[in-house]
Regions:
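Structured, active/binding-site neighborhoods that engage oxygen-rich ligands
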Residues: 1-338
């Protein structure tokens, strides 16, 4: 939903440039863009709304947005269409699931459908659990559950440690693309928040896989706090393509009618960023060119792409690229220069 999309967009510029505080300004960097998190969130909204198989819809959206930052195995799954899931426990199942919490009427249906939609790719038990926990939070929040009721249910049902605060997590938290290392932290960011924007800021302040973690938090926060503030909704909607905006507003009209969403949809095409985009302190490149030059491998590492047709680094090259974020950025910085 748009709360999840907002988290993805706001977090897009911090995934490889983490910050560990809430007081960043502005909320939306002028460099902010939607990533694979938003693409697959909208794809699920579309699939549910039109009652079309999610695997078919995901592959179509992939063809429309092939450079949105997907993982290596998802690239392969879309490109070769084997029809087989790849046993992933990554947080991709949780990032795209927010629509499930709105489209079904009982917690049992929500859990069943979250498993169903996750299992096209993320059929590992942890991948399924992450999608179910996120969907359950959203369902309970929109039904009026208290934060403590949500905390208790998720802890008992899924075994996640939610008896922490963001201040407990932040100092030692590092990049983690697993469900088990992202979903609990995203839920805690929501639980510690005071309103929608604060939830987004809490999630960003943890660092890690910022776009996906904040995407998960944003989806839950929207369900709990209600309509997203209008100025935030407009900026998020504006960053989507017209086709994606149309899918979003159609889904809301069917499952969660909102004048705020309709107005954001109407205003999005008229919204203009006031200042020209400036270079980042580290690097600046537009979304399309960035994802043409790199690829994520199965472990979530950013690697340089060898050719334009998605050939990947050989095993020797992969083994010799460290998983350390700062080192990766230093080695690949030349790829991102204008």
């Amino acid at each position: 939903m748009l709360g999840a999309i907002t988290g993805d967009v706001v977090g897009s510029v911090y995934e490889w440039n983490n910050i560990k505080h809430k007081d960043f300004k502005p909320l939306f960097s002028q460099r902010a863009f939607f990533t694979d998190d938003s693409v697959l969130t909208v794809a699920l909204m579309d699939a549910i709304d039109r009652s079309v198989s999610y695997d078919t819809v995901m592959r179509w959206y992939y063809t429309q947005h092939p450079h949105a930052g997907y993982g290596h195995r998802f690239h392969h799954w879309c490109k070769y269409d084997t029809g087989m899931a790849y046993n992933s426990w990554g947080n991709g199942s949780a990032m795209r699931t927010s629509a499930v919490g709105y489209a079904y009427d009982t917690i049992e249906e929500v859990l069943e459908q979250a498993k169903h939609f996750a299992s096209f790719t993320h059929n590992h038990p942890e991948g399924i659990k992450g999608a179910q926990a996120t969907s359950a939070c959203i369902f309970m929040a929109r039904k009026g559950a208290t934060k403590e009721a949500i905390r208790t249910y998720i802890t008992n049902q899924f075994g996640y440690d939610l008896n922490r605060t963001i201040d407990d997590i932040r100092p030692d938290y590092k990049f983690n693309e697993s469900c088990q290392g992202t979903v609990p932290e995203a839920i805690v960011a929501f639980l510690d928040s005071t309103d929608f924007e604060d939830a987004i800021r809490c999630a960003i302040s943890l660092g890690g896989d910022s776009d996906t973690l904040t995407c998960i938090t944003g989806g839950i926060a929207e369900a709990f706090y209600g309509d997203i503030p209008q100025n935030i909704a407009v900026q998020s909607m504006h960053r989507l393509t017209p086709q994606m905006r149309d899918v979003v507003v159609k889904f809301y009209d069917k499952y969660r009618p909102s004048e705020a969403i309709r107005l954001a949809h109407k205003m999005a095409g008229q919204f203009v960023v006031a200042k020209p985009v400036e270079r980042d302190d580290y690097f600046h490149i537009d979304q399309q060119n960035f994802w043409k030059t790199v690829v994520k491998d199965g472990d979530g590492n950013i690697l340089p792409r060898k050719t334009k047709d998605m050939d990947y680094l050989d095993d020797f090259e992969r083994r010799n690229i460290t998983k350390n974020k700062d080192t990766i950025m230093e080695k690949l910085k030349h790829l991102f220069e204008l």
